[in-house]
């Protein structure tokens, strides 16, 4: 697995860049009405919101989507997870078709992954995206070559070990 990093002047700058990358991924997947930095009801700060349409016999079903983007150097821990769930379930109270996505640049710790796995077993429309899944999405959006090709090109210029 490649470790993805976002370079920026501050943690806010890095977060904004990850939000922009998330918006680009959603746009490439045909999500619509993508807006960054929305303050929802009750003062909930939502990093990215969008809508996703699925065909239905009586017309398209529109699913609101709330995204939380974490550009931390370390893995997302259990203190961030309930905050995201609160935002997600608030959106579900407004529209039962709402979906939630947490983008975790450096992944999530075992407690978060365990909690996420438990929620998935209940068929809740929520996603935790990090690591290879995030890289694949970005590679698709930005037409990046596969990791092996990047590694070969870099090794042409240096003998230093490439950490993955």
Give the predicted meaning of each segment.
Residues 1-164:
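Mixed-charge (Asp/Glu-Lys/Arg
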């Amino acid at each position: 697995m490649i470790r993805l990093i976002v370079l920026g002047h501050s943690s806010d700058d890095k977060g904004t860049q990850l939000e922009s990358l998330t918006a680009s991924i959603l746009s490439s997947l045909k999500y619509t009405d993508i807006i960054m930095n929305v303050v929802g009801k009750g003062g909930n700060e939502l990093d990215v919101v969008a809508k996703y349409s699925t065909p239905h016999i009586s017309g398209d079903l529109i699913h609101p989507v709330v995204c939380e983007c974490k550009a931390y150097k370390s893995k997302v821990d259990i203190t961030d997870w309930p905050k995201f769930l609160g935002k997600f379930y608030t959106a579900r109270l407004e529209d039962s078709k709402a979906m939630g996505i947490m983008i975790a640049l450096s992944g999530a710790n075992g407690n978060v992954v365990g909690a996420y796995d438990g929620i998935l077993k209940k068929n809740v429309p929520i996603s935790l995206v990090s690591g290879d899944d995030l890289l694949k999405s970005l590679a698709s959006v930005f037409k990046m070559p596969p990791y092996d090709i990047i590694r070969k090109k870099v090794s042409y210029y240096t003998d230093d070990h490439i950490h993955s």
